[in-house]
């Protein structure tokens, strides 16, 4: 298994050292792990194996040496042989241990030439296993207590057996004729083998329960992740639905109010234009009247001057009067043109601009309203045809598939596992009672035989 496929997190050096020291591995320091040596890693792995598996490499080698004897070894090769055998046994045990905790590629190089990154990865696997073991230890307390009780009873039976063996040996020393027959000894050995088989079965049951519980936990986490993803989708769809409802309920009213205000403003500006037009017409009529009066006065004066012609003084006065009248006319025209006409032109331009803006705004409003209606209709159709079926389908899927299906299935599997476990426990209790009966029967027979 490659590093990217590991089922456990790779810890940094500081956290790794803290976790290992909390597990009573005092040798674990940042300096030793960052620059590992062969002797250091061999010593640390021996402590890990002895702590988690209860196996001592030295004790295995000592027992093996006692069984095989050292006579076949030469004196100069004995130390080399023992060191090599020590590393081989440690490598085999470490390979099996790391394989059980999720590392498939442990090899001899990790003992002879350890690398910092691989060492950090292997020790991270050990910490992850220790955490999982500590978390699951509470679930296995009842099994551990039962196993300890059975082991205590088994040790008691072995002690009884050893006591009987000692008594038999004493009787053999006293009287060589009182030797148990071979059939009874063979029967006793078979019973011991049955006890060992029962112990192995209990160990396998414990491992199977741990694996089943881990699978159940993984399945539960996967279902929770699916439910979380579906919840996010539902929240997003509900948010989009609320936005569509807000657009359909709010924007049309605001547009209608805006159009109404603009229409009122247009009516007001038209009324102002009509008033100004009427004032302009009145002023034009006044100017026309003044022009008529001036023309008539000029004609009268001209007739008078042509009829009288008495003196140049009178003519000069008439010319001056005419000039004054002309000046007054020009002044009046200038006043009209520069005052009221200028204001009328400004108001006319403003009115034309407002009319153009109003017309453009009305067109834009109509176009925007049409686009909003079209978009709202499309969104409504899309919601009805796509989003709502998905929401309904999601609700049905959550209700039927996840809640009613997978969770019920997992509950059924858990109940079935509990039933199977209870059946196996009952079978073990029955076998244990039978075994106890056989041992008691054997003890009674041995006592009767010795008496």
Swiss-Prot record:
It comes from the Eukaryota. GO terms for molecular function: protein-containing complex binding. Present with 1550 molecules/cell in log phase SD medium. InterPro entries: Kinetochore_Nuf2_N, Nuf2_N_sf. Acts as a component of the essential kinetochore-associated NDC80 complex, which is involved in chromosome segregation and spindle checkpoint activity. One of its GO terms (biological process) is meiotic chromosome segregation. Changing residue 338 to P: Temperature-sensitive. The keyword Amino-acid biosynthesis does not apply. This is Kinetochore protein NUF2. Residues 153-291, 341-371, 398-432 form a coiled coil. GO terms for cellular component: condensed chromosome, centromeric region; kinetochore; Ndc80 complex; nucleus; outer kinetochore; spindle microtubule; spindle pole body. The keyword Membrane does not apply. Keywords: Cell cycle, Cell division, Centromere, Chromosome, Coiled coil, Kinetochore, Mitosis, Nucleus. Belongs to the NUF2 family.
């Amino acid at each position: 298994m490659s590093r990217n496929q590991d089922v456990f997190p790779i810890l940094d050096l500081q956290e790794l050292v803290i976790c290992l020291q909390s597990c009573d591995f005092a040798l674990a320091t940042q300096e030793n792990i960052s620059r590992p040596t062969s002797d250091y890693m061999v010593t640390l792995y021996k402590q890990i194996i002895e702590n988690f598996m209860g196996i001592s490499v030295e004790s295995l080698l000592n027992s093996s040496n006692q069984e095989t004897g050292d006579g076949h070894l030469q004196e100069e090769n004995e130390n080399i042989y023992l060191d090599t055998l020590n590393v081989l046994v440690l490598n085999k045990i470490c390979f099996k241990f790391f394989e059980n905790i999720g590392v498939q590629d442990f090899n001899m190089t990790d003992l002879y030439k350890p690398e910092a990154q691989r060492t950090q990865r292997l020790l991270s696997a050990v910490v992850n296993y220790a955490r999982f073991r500590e978390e699951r230890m509470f679930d296995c307390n009842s099994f551990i207590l039962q196993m300890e009780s059975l082991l205590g009873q088994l040790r008691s039976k072995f002690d009884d057996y050893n006591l009987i063996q000692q008594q038999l040996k004493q009787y053999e020393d006293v009287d060589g004729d009182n030797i148990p027959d071979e059939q009874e000894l063979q029967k006793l050995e078979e019973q011991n083998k049955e006890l060992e088989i029962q112990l192995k079965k209990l160990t396998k049951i414990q491992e199977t329960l741990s694996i089943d519980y881990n699978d159940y936990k993984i399945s539960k986490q996967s279902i929770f992740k699916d439910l979380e993803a579906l919840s996010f989708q539902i929240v997003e769809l509900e948010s989009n639905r609320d936005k569509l409802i807000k657009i359909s309920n709010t924007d049309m009213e605001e547009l209608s109010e805006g159009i109404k205000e603009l229409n009122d403003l247009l009516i007001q500006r038209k009324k102002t234009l009509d008033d100004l037009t009427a004032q302009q017409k009145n002023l034009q009529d006044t100017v026309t009247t003044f022009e008529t009066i001036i023309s008539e006065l000029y004609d009268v004066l001209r007739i008078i001057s042509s009829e009288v012609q008495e003196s140049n003084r009178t003519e000069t006065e008439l010319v001056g009067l005419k000039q004054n009248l002309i000046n007054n006319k020009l002044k009046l025209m200038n006043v009209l043109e520069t005052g009221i006409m200028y204001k009328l032109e400004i108001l006319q331009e403003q009115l034309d601009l407002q009319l153009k803006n109003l017309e453009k705004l009305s067109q834009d409003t109509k176009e925007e309203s049409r686009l909003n209606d079209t978009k709202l209709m499309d969104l409504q159709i899309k919601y009805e045809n796509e989003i709502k079926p998905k929401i309904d389908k999601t609700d049905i899927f959550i209700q039927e598939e996840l809640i009613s299906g997978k969770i019920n299935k997992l509950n059924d599997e858990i109940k079935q596992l509990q039933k199977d476990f209870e059946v196996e426990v009952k079978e073990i209790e029955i076998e244990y009672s039978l075994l106890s009966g056989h041992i008691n029967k054997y003890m009674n027979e041995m006592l009767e035989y010795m008496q």
